[in-house]
UniProtKB/Swiss-Prot annotation:
Residues 1-187 form the SPX domain. PROSITE patterns: SPX. Residues 226-237 have a biased composition (Low complexity). GO terms for cellular component: cytosol; nucleus. GO terms for biological process: cellular response to phosphate starvation; phosphate ion homeostasis. Residues 305-318 have a biased composition (Basic and acidic residues). This is SPX domain-containing protein 4. PANTHER family: SPX DOMAIN-CONTAINING PROTEIN 3 (PTHR45978), SPX DOMAIN-CONTAINING PROTEIN 4 (PTHR45978:SF7). Residues 226-247, 284-318 are annotated as: Disordered. It comes from Arabidopsis thaliana. InterPro entries: SPX_dom (IPR004331), SPX_prot (IPR031142). Pfam families: SPX.
Length: 318
């Protein structure tokens, strides 16, 4: 499945209130159609310039080049529009970061409150009026743990999918204009808050540990990753089937989160399929160890690496 279709399918299956927080991939793709097409032999239409130098030599300050407001001297005319294109991408980064940081802070607070509730239940041991009262309190905690775990996994996949979309649209930009924007902008993205998922990963594992400790026989969400792996090996792209038992246990609101989580994880599995040609900027290369560590300056792509592959590297090949 092509990336655009995969991305659109995920947006349709995710939580409605999250949809406008994702990359505006389709509008950006349409915008590129207005850019002059670059020919390796003749350069862009009506151009006498054939300079192959990147516009941004300083990869640590991409936004500065977007603020000069005009044509960069000695650079291909197709790059007149690069400043406006980068401004749009920077606005998208700001949107990702704001949403991600707000959600992460919310998770920290909610998980701490749940841990305090668990401690309160332990302290009240033997003080409940009935066994049913104890069971009801524990089920409420369990439901809230399942809910927050699902939202955390959704946020991790939010990070991955938006990164994949940025890499894809930057590749299209470079191919269309003959520019060299993809590498410096991608290196900038690697250090953005929305792509720094180590703290979130720790929260996910802490939540899973509580689920497995308190409810070892009923940790549906903890086991969802293996279930999604099985789904991703097939070519079915319908919504995952949810058992009647799971539905009645989670409730309608939590079930929506659960289903969206499975859909997001299935989309990521599809995007992580390795391409036949190694590319240090490919989605699968950068995210293959996401569960263990975030990409850092030490293991990020070296600026000397070049992308010679014409094969799509942000999605499954066909």
């Amino acid at each position: 499945m092509k990336f655009g279709k995969e991305f659109r399918t995920h947006l349709e299956e995710t939580l409605p209130e999250w949809r406008d927080k994702f990359l505006c991939y389709k509008p950006l793709k349409k915008l590129l159609k207005y850019y002059p097409y670059y020919s390796a032999d003749f350069g862009p239409a009506n151009s006498d310039h054939n300079d192959s130098r990147p516009v941004f030599a300083d990869t640590t300050n991409i936004s500065s080049a977007a603020d000069d407001g005009g044509v960069v001297p000695g650079v291909r005319p197709s790059e007149d529009l690069q400043g406006s294109f980068v401004r749009i991408l920077n606005d998208e980064l700001e949107k990702f970061n704001d949403f991600y940081v707000d959600k992460e802070e919310d998770f920290v607070i909610r998980l701490q409150e749940l841990k305090e509730r668990i401690e309160q239940v332990k302290e009240k041991n033997g003080e409940f009026a009935s066994e049913s009262e104890f069971s009801e309190e524990m089920m409420d905690i369990r439901r809230d743990l399942v809910t927050i775990h699902g939202e955390m996994v959704l946020l991790k996949n939010y990070s991955s999918l938006n990164f994949a979309g940025l890499v894809k649209i930057l590749k299209k930009y470079d191919k269309r204009t003959g520019g060299l924007l993809r590498l410096p902008f991608t290196q900038l993205v690697l250090h953005q808050p929305f792509f720094t998922t180590e703290p979130l990963t720790r929260l996910v594992r802490e939540c899973e540990a509580n689920l497995e400790l308190l409810f070892p026989s009923e940790a549906e969400v903890v086991e969802s990753s293996s279930a999604v792996q099985a789904h991703s090996s097939s070519h079915q792209h319908n919504s995952p089937r949810i058992s009647a038992e799971t539905s009645s246990t989670l409730g309608n609101e939590n079930l929506d989160i659960y289903k969206s989580t499975l859909a997001a994880m299935r989309a990521i599995r599809g995007l992580q399929k390795a391409s036949s040609t190694y590319n240090p900027l490919s989605f699968s290369s950068l995210l293959q160890n996401e569960d263990d560590e975030t990409v850092t300056a030490e293991n990020s792509p070296n600026s000397g690496n070049k992308d010679d592959s014409e094969k799509e590297d942000t999605g499954p090949s066909h």
